[in-house]
């Protein structure tokens, strides 16, 4: 089958079949409402980043170009083939993803190594999540969550009808042990550009708050649930949501990453619904501020553009992200996500005499007085 390469501004290459057929038919979305998804249950998670050499010799030994997409989040790496990394290299990948939030790898053969090899590589970071209603490949594994938007399947568009398609979130935060290091492989991107992923640093979202407000948030927990998402899918006739049903978990508002020990704001507007112990109106007020803080502070976010062979690796414990449906209806955006689950979120707590609080508070007081 013949293909054509589409060149868009910014030298992004996007291959397309001349007859309009998908480039990767084996990854077409398959929905089966009769399948039941079993809960993995509690498990002990050891983050591979603990074993990593902080100098990253195994990860970056073949790198030809490495640069930061923004000061606080995002690094693009050329010359490294993810499929060729050994265990030590994957450990270092986990560490760098935790430190930088999101990593972009170009010219990858990851798509071509097959379902089983993909799962084996990504399961290095934890047991793989199976989505409660999103599709998977008909001939592949349930762990592969298919990302698909095209004129022959407008379910993504229907799900976001009447709402902004830019919705900052952390995938599957209603799980008792939510995702950590996660992979997206883009198979086919819109011909007109667009379809990027936005990523925001939750570490910087936390640290950029005033010290007294940070202190107030620490020790709080919030309810995360997918109830709204399940209801929305049922509204559009998506019976596959009943494969798993409604999930709910209580997580700290501020967590600590198990490897880097950095504190991160762990709330998102898609799944976080209420701060425990607060009246609903009080909770809504605080959460609205935090959601706006995440969405509006572009000084700690980056934008991931896709091209053929791009793989995005990011740590969901220290980031929020969003899709962008900014391309014409009918243009194809096709990819898949593999999502390892990680540790139960670790709550952050600063004591009254914490040096970090005292130092930062003094800095803010000086700034306010000037």
From Swiss-Prot:
Fe cation binds at residues 169, 171, 321. Its cofactor is Fe(2+). It comes from the Eukaryota. One of its GO terms (molecular function) is metal ion binding. Keywords: Dioxygenase, Iron, Metal-binding, Oxidoreductase. 2-oxoglutarate binds at residues 197, 333, 337. Residues 1-20 are annotated as: Disordered. GO terms for cellular component: cytoplasm. Pfam families: TauD. Substrate binds at residues 131, 337. Disulfide bonds: none annotated. Alpha-ketoglutarate-dependent dioxygenase; part of the gene cluster that mediates the biosynthesis of communesins, a prominent class of indole alkaloids with great potential as pharmaceuticals. Communesins are biosynthesized by the coupling of tryptamine and aurantioclavine, two building blocks derived from L-tryptophan. This is Alpha-ketoglutarate-dependent dioxygenase cnsP.
């Amino acid at each position: 089958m013949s293909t054509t390469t589409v060149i868009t501004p910014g030298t992004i290459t996007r291959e397309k079949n001349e007859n309009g057929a998908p480039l990767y038919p084996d990854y077409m979305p398959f929905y089966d409402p009769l399948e039941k998804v079993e809960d993995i249950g509690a498990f002990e998670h050891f983050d591979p980043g603990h074993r990593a050499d902080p100098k990253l010799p195994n990860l970056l030994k073949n790198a030809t170009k490495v640069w930061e997409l923004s000061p606080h989040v995002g690094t693009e790496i050329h010359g490294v083939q993810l499929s060729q990394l050994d265990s030590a290299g994957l450990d270092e990948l986990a560490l760098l993803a935790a430190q930088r939030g999101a990593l972009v790898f170009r010219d990858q053969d990851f798509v071509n190594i097959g379902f089983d090899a993909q799962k084996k590589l990504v399961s290095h970071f934890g047991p793989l999540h199976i989505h409660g209603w999103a599709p998977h490949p008909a001939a592949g594994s349930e762990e592969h969550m298919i990302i698909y938007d095209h004129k022959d399947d407008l379910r993504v568009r229907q799900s976001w009808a009447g709402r902004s398609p830019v919705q900052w979130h952390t995938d599957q935060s209603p799980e008792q042990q939510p995702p950590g290091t996660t992979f997206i492989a883009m198979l086919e991107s819109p011909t007109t550009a667009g379809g990027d992923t936005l990523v925001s640093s939750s570490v910087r979202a936390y640290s950029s708050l005033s010290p007294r407000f940070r202190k107030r948030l620490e020790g709080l927990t919030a309810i995360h649930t997918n109830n709204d998402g399940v209801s929305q899918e049922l509204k559009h006739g998506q019976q596959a949501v009943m494969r798993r049903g409604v999930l709910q978990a209580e997580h700290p508002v501020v967590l600590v990453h198990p490897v880097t020990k950095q504190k991160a704001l762990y709330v998102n507007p898609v799944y976080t619904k209420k701060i425990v112990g607060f009246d609903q109106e009080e909770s809504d007020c605080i959460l609205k501020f935090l959601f706006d803080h995440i969405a509006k502070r572009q000084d700690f976010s980056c934008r991931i553009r896709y091209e053929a062979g791009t793989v995005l690796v990011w740590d969901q414990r220290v980031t929020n992200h969003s899709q962008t449906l900014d391309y014409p209806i009918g243009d194809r955006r096709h990819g898949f996500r593999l999502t390892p689950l990680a540790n139960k979120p670790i709550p952050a707590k600063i004591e009254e005499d914490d040096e970090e609080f005292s130092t930062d508070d003094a800095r803010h007081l000086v700034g306010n007085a000037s």
